[in-house]
Amino acid sequence: MNKSEKRNVEIVLNAFDILFNKRDYATAERFWSPNYIQHSAHIPPGRDGLFDLVKGLPATLRYENHIAAATGDFVILHGRFSGIGLPAAWVVADIVRMEDGILAEHWDVIQDEATREQS
């Protein structure tokens, strides 16, 4: 990764930590574009849709990142959301397009975490 790509990864990881783990919505607004485009079938449109979804999730929600990479303006994450109020945690691949140092667009693939017996 070049310097710009590394910086984009740092920004996205920090943004995810602030929104999902710390639930600091005022600070998180600085990381997400007001014109944020959401392509997930699981998340309501826009920045407000994402923030409202998180506000409605249990306080036990946690995001753990396992893999982070970038190419150009795109950051790709593989991580785990736990404490979501469901029997299984979610394993998620997120793709974020950055624009002017903020999160501008998002795609994801979500699946229930398999147990050891299921793997």
Language model feature labels by segment:
Residues 1-119:
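C-terminal and inter-domain tail/linker signature
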